[in-house]
């Protein structure tokens, strides 16, 4: 798993991994998952 430059919560990474996506961070306190994180 490649590490992101910014630190993301492990819960976010784990919930996104279930969808086979990457955690891009939190949006309104909710995990924001995407295949590609922009910027």
Swiss-Prot record:
Compartments, record wording: Secreted
Transferase found in the keyword field: no
GO cellular component annotations of the record: extracellular region
GO molecular function: toxin activity
Chief location of this protein within or outside the cell: secreted
Assigned keywords, A-Z: Amidation, Cleavage on pair of basic residues, Disulfide bond, Knottin, Neurotoxin, Secreted, Toxin
Expression across tissues: Expressed by the venom duct.
Propeptide feature ranges: 1-5
Cystines in this chain: 12-24, 16-33, 23-37
Secreted listed as a keyword: yes
Modification Tryptophan amide, positions: 38
Family membership noted in the UniProt record: Belongs to the conotoxin O3 superfamily.
Domain remarks: The presence of a 'disulfide through disulfide knot' structurally defines this protein as a knottin. The cysteine framework is VI/VII (C-C-CC-C-C).
Protein name, UniProt field: Conotoxin ArMSGL-013
The organism of origin for this protein: Conus arenatus (Sand-dusted cone)
């Amino acid at each position: 798993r490649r590490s992101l430059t910014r630190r993301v919560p492990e819960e976010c990474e784990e919930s996104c991994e279930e969808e086979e996506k990457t955690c891009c961070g939190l949006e309104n306190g909710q995990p924001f998952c995407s295949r590609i994180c922009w910027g």
